[in-house]
Regions:
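Ser/Thr-glycine-rich phosphate-binding loops at phosphate-binding pockets of nucleotides
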Residues: 213, 217-218
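N-terminal non-cleavable signal-anchor helices
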Residues: 9-12, 20, 163, 175
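C-terminal motif of bacterial Sec signal peptides marking the signal peptidase cleavage site
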Residues: 22-26
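Bacterial N-terminal signal peptides that target proteins for export
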Residues: 1-14
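Non-catalytic accessory regions used for complex assembly or targeting
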Residues: 13-14, 18-21, 32-37
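Catalytic nucleophile loop of clan PA
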Residues: 210
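Cys-dependent protein tyrosine phosphatase-like superfamily
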Residues: 27-207, 220-323
Length: 323
């Protein structure tokens, strides 16, 4: 029982714990009269690498503007409206200024659950509505609370030792592969991802969503949002995989240790999934969605409750014709 408890804690640590670019443009169009476009839009000084949409925050990890991504109909996502990131616990005054002045931030969606939020509360930004949309299935939350797993950051004492110890355990390796399927098939998670999509549709200003490290649960939120906006599978996968660039140094260092200890590919993949993201597991779960629900389009409508009409309104609000 003790080992099982520790296995659960280890696997959950990661879950609690960076395309195509065209041009910078504001999203003002005749179909979006109810929405006041962000002005001024972010400049290259506020997007460190415009082709990758990385935002230079001081205290917020893994932050990206979703602008510039090309949808299947040729339109692009507007810059200055949609941001994905890690938690806002250490957001600095300069970070807040960017979110207020450049993004006109009105809404933050937090995919973490109550214990995570109580251990590491977001910085409160004046005028912003915070909405909790926990997308960790309840059965995993209960296990995590029972065994007292923390936020799962690599800076937590002993976390690296635990990761290295269980990287070689086939049972844990297999458990990691099941995390994404559990999330996308859980009714509570589906309901909250649907709530997130409707929140993005209804937002009066810029929107930011995050979990702990901004990679797994936020990655799925971004995937569903991009799918609703009309992105191809390739664009969705590439955006999800970009989080690996944010954590590449840590992944490479720990993977090297695993190889030095004669660990096989299963152990290396475990480190990749826990510290970065497993794009392999992500794609396998996209396949699962197609197999179990018919298609991503049907999943959005039937599981997340986001209709075709909702999707058309979302596209009118956040897409613009390419220059």
């Amino acid at each position: 029982m003790a080992k099982k408890s520790f296995l659960v804690k280890t696997v959950l640590m990661s879950m609690l714990t960076a395309v195509t670019f065209t041009s910078f443009a504001s999203c003002s169009n005749d179909d979006d009269m109810a929405y006041e476009p962000v002005s001024p839009v972010p400049t290259r000084e506020h997007v460190a690498d415009s082709s990758q949409r990385v935002i230079k925050f001081e205290g917020v990890d893994n932050a990206r503007d979703m602008g510039g991504l090309v949808m299947q109909d040729g339109r692009t996502v507007c810059f200055g409206k949609l941001v994905r990131s890690g938690k806002l616990v250490k957001a600095t005054d300069a970070d807040v200024a960017i979110l207020q002045d450049r993004y006109h931030l009105s809404d933050v969606f937090d995919f973490r659950f109550a214990l995570e939020m109580s251990e590491a509360s977001d910085r409160v930004i004046s005028g912003v509505t915070y909405t909790q949309v926990s997308t960790m299935p309840q059965k995993l939350i209960e296990l995590q609370e029972k065994f007292g797993a923390g936020s799962g950051q690599l800076s937590t004492p002993g976390t690296i030792d635990v990761l290295m110890k269980y990287a070689f355990d086939p049972e844990v390796q297999e458990m990691v592969k099941q995390l994404y399927p559990i999330i996308v098939t859980d009714p509570q998670s589906q309901a909250n991802y649907g709530k997130f999509l409707h929140g993005v549709l209804d937002a009066k200003g810029g929107v930011l969503w995050h979990c702990s490290e901004g990679k797994d649960r936020s990655g799925w939120g971004s995937a569903f949002l991009l799918a609703a906006l009309g992105a191809s599978r390739q664009v969705i996968v590439e955006d999800f995989d970009k989080s690996n660039e944010s954590y590449a140094t840590e992944v490479e260092a720990l993977s090297a240790q695993v190889r030095d200890m004669k660990g096989g590919e299963g152990a290396v993949e475990f480190i990749q999934a826990m510290v970065g993201v497993s794009t392999k597991n992500f794609e396998a779960t996209l396949d699962l969605i197609d197999q179990q629900y018919g298609s991503m389009e049907q999943y959005l409508e039937n599981q997340l409750g986001f209709s075709k009409e909702d999707q058309n309104l979302l596209r009118a609000k956040y897409l613009i014709a390419a220059n």
